[in-house]
């Protein structure tokens, strides 16, 4: 199952058992059988009947604004939610020791994934290894988040050494709005990854509102932000380098906005095409002794967390 991306403006309707997008240029029909979720970037109209159809077919729909920022999600009625597991999620959040175990594991493994990403590209990452040790010694989540933020800034400076075109270097991480080409690409990629993880959470018994590294507060969802941290190097950062160093993306794919930049529709379309390809790419899983897609790896992490919460397996350990 894959994501459907809509950049055109128009009206979304149900036609028989398909999704129909009506635009000035005509109608586009999308069979629902293989749709995991819908990501809307254009200006679309829809009605309650269409949302009922998506709910019946268990398809989340994510909305992004013109600049590519995530706005919100229509999250269908949770058909797999388990009251028992929700209680376990809450218990592991409220109990500081249990929460720290999960949060520390996420940070530690995300650091290791950054190190592996750099080592594959012949970049020394000794300082990140030191941050990993600091994370293991952190006493609370706030301290852990501070360590993670400092490490990621250093990590991005190392990525800059791999960028062939200096105009596309990160220099300093900026957001809302991103100030340069690199930050625009990374922010857009992260937004896509967050919604991908959110849609995959919907296919589990987990509640996306209860996270462990990111605070569970008035933010609608936080668990997807936690799990996405593990996959940013392999998905978003790798894609960023590939698009820039192969010169697939250039200045023509960006528009200036107030105090920053955004990807235009051509740039977004190019990015999501390569993003979906990255999610389909496979890696060899030693334990399973077979190749699995990146999307499948994300879902496997969610199942590991489920098992941890009910006491079947320690999160991060090999099955």
Curated annotation (Swiss-Prot):
Domain of life: Bacteria
Gene Ontology BP annotations: defense response to virus; maintenance of CRISPR repeat elements
Entry's Gene Ontology molecular function annotations: DNA binding; DNA endonuclease activity; metal ion binding
Classification via CDD domains: Cas1_I-B
Cited InterPro entries: CRISPR-assoc_Cas1 (IPR002729), CRISPR-assoc_Cas1_C (IPR042206), CRISPR-assoc_Cas1_HMARI/TNEAP (IPR019858), CRISPR-assoc_Cas1_N (IPR042211)
Chain's role: CRISPR (clustered regularly interspaced short palindromic repeat), is an adaptive immune system that provides protection against mobile genetic elements (viruses, transposable elements and conjugative plasmids). CRISPR clusters contain sequences complementary to antecedent mobile elements and target invading nucleic acids. CRISPR clusters are transcribed and processed into CRISPR RNA (crRNA). Acts as a dsDNA endonuclease. Involved in the integration of spacer DNA into the CRISPR cassette.
SUBUNIT field: Homodimer. Forms a heterotetramer with a Cas2 homodimer.
Protein name (database record): CRISPR-associated endonuclease Cas1
């Amino acid at each position: 199952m894959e994501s459907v991306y809509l950049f055109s403006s128009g009206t979304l309707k149900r036609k028989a058992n398909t999704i129909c997008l009506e635009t000035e240029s005509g109608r586009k029909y999308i069979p629902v059988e293989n749709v995991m979720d819908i990501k809307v970037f254009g200006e679309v109209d829809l009605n309650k009947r269409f949302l009922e159809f998506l709910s019946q077919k268990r398809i989340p729909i994510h909305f992004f604004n013109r600049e590519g920022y995530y706005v919100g999600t229509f999250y269908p009625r949770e058909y797999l939610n388990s009251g028992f597991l929700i209680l376990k999620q809450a218990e592991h959040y409220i109990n500081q020791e249990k929460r720290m175990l999960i949060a520390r594991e996420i940070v530690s493994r995300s650091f290791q994934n950054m190190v592996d990403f750099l080592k594959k590209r012949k970049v020394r990452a000794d300082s990140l290894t030191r941050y990993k040790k600091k994370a293991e010694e952190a006493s609370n989540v706030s301290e852990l988040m501070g360590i993670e933020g400092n490490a990621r800034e250093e990590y991005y400076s190392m990525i800059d050494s791999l960028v062939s075109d200096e105009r596309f270097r990160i220099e300093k991480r900026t957001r809302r709005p991103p100030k340069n080409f690199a930050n625009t690409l990374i922010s857009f990629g992260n937004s896509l990854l967050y919604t991908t993880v959110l849609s995959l959470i919907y296919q589990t018994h987990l509640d996306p509102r209860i996270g462990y590294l990111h605070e569970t507060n008035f933010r609608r969802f936080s668990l997807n932000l936690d799990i996405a941290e593990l996959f940013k190097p392999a998905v978003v950062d790798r894609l960023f380098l590939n698009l820039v160093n192969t010169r697939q993306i250039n200045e023509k794919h960006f528009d200036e906005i107030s105090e920053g930049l955004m990807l235009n529709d051509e740039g977004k379309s190019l990015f999501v095409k390569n993003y979906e390809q990255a999610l389909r790419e496979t890696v060899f899983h030693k334990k399973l002794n077979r190749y699995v897609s990146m999307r499948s790896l994300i879902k496997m992490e969610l199942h590991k967390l489920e098992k941890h919460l009910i006491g079947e397996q320690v999160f991060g350990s090999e099955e």
